[in-house]
């Protein structure tokens, strides 16, 4: 398999923004061990982000406090907006939501990073159409700053 890295994103703690809360200066990063004690709205297993969060917390000897399990970023953000708990998502996921200003974002320490890679067979050569599509995907990710 030939693997091409596309995106590396940092996960942040997403919470309902209290009315009038200013984001300047941004709050200090929150220790991951402390995040584990907060009620989280998180995807159900098996989900790459869920598994990554659980593995990183396990390395610290803690487990996440799951408030709700639901799949889909928009559903997770709706539940956070309704006060059901906090979430661990990328800034891009929140920024592309319907109501990005409804949320407060806070960095985690140590940072949680996710990676998206493009995998293709190294034993079967890609067609010209496949190669053009792959090149376009890489170009779009770079252009978007992802």
How would you name each of these model-derived features?
Residues 15, 21-24, 29-32, 39-60, ...:
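Secondary-structure junction motif
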Residues 9, 31, 75, 114:
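Conserved sugar-transfer catalytic core signal across GT-A, GT-B, and GT-C glycosyltransferases
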Residues 46-104:
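Hydrophobic hinge/microswitch elements
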Residues 1-16, 23-24, 29, 81-84, ...:
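Short beta-strand-centered segments that line the small-molecule binding cleft or hinge
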Residues 20-21, 104-146:
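A late-sequence structural motif
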């Amino acid at each position: 398999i030939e693997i091409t890295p596309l995106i590396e994103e940092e996960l942040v703690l997403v919470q309902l923004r209290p009315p009038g809360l200013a984001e300047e200066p941004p709050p200090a990063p929150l220790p991951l061990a402390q995040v584990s004690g907060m009620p989280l709205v998180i995807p159900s297993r098996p989900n790459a982000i869920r598994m990554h969060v659980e593995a990183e917390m396990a390395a610290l000897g803690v487990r996440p406090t799951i408030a709700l399990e639901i799949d889909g970023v928009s559903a997770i953000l709706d539940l956070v907006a309704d006060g059901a708990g906090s979430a661990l998502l990328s800034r891009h996921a929140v920024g592309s939501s319907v109501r990005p200003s409804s949320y407060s974002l806070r960095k985690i320490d140590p940072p949680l990073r996710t990676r998206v890679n493009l995998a293709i067979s190294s034993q079967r050569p890609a067609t010209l159409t496949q190669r053009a599509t792959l090149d376009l995907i890489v170009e779009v990710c770079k252009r978007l700053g992802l």
